[in-house]
Amino acid sequence: AEKACELIEVEYEVLPWAIEIDDAIKPDAPILHDHIQFDGKPSNIAGTLEHKKGDINKGFSEADVIIEREFKTEAVHQGYLETHSCLVSVAADGRATIWSSSQGQFMVRAMTSFITGIPQSSIRAIPAEIGGGFGGKTIVYLEPVATILSKKSGRPVKMVMTREEVMRASGPTSGSKSKVKIGAKNDGKITAAQGTFYLQAGAFPGAPIRGAAGCCLAPYEIPNAHTFGYDVVSNRSKVAAYRAPGAPIGAYAVECVLDEVAEALKMCPLEFRLKNLIKFHKIRLKSLPHE
């Protein structure tokens, strides 16, 4: 099979592309999907998420110290030791059995059924013990392909990605571009916080903006806050989960700014955080009680 693949010659028509977030959101950026609209026109911004609490302008006007910083993080792969692999056998009666290196059988069964057209009731998915996943194996790549090949050939089919194929074709976590602004009074109380987060989705929508915009301020009681997340498509592999998807991006930016605010106030960073720690049953930014 590998020798046969080497004989295939592919001719590509090279089109304009956008790799980085800044390239994808600029006014003259090449549009990946015409049906994706933002502000009434085709755009690479596939979705947004906004959280508000209090009066952000009033909060900053009350602050004695204000720190604003921008951050950029690159896409990072989960780096699991075992590559994606599966073994699929489709019997004469059309019932399929899938053994795969995955993080869940229900997802494998549902997605394989959706792609192949085989009813879920005719698919048995067996997740094997895996050599690491960290969120990167909560999606299927090989299972539907192996299922179709097994059905056509009448024989079991085994597929294993090479390390190069994993890095080229499977989903890493999002790269990001963020801006965070935090204000506090001289006594150490935070009066306002604002965060804007652009996350790479890859070629199709689905960046974990909820984790970045929704969780970045979760540990703290802040009377005036505003966060905004942008789901940005670009010419990259579709992203996948990676250990609390999106949350480290938001937390990293916020915590870095908190360190600078504490330094400007000449406070211990730990004491500064404890002073602003949210209490049980207080309302978080997402209008939910902290429990």
Where does each model-flagged region fall?
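Structural alpha/beta core scaffold segments of enzyme domains
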Residues: 1-291
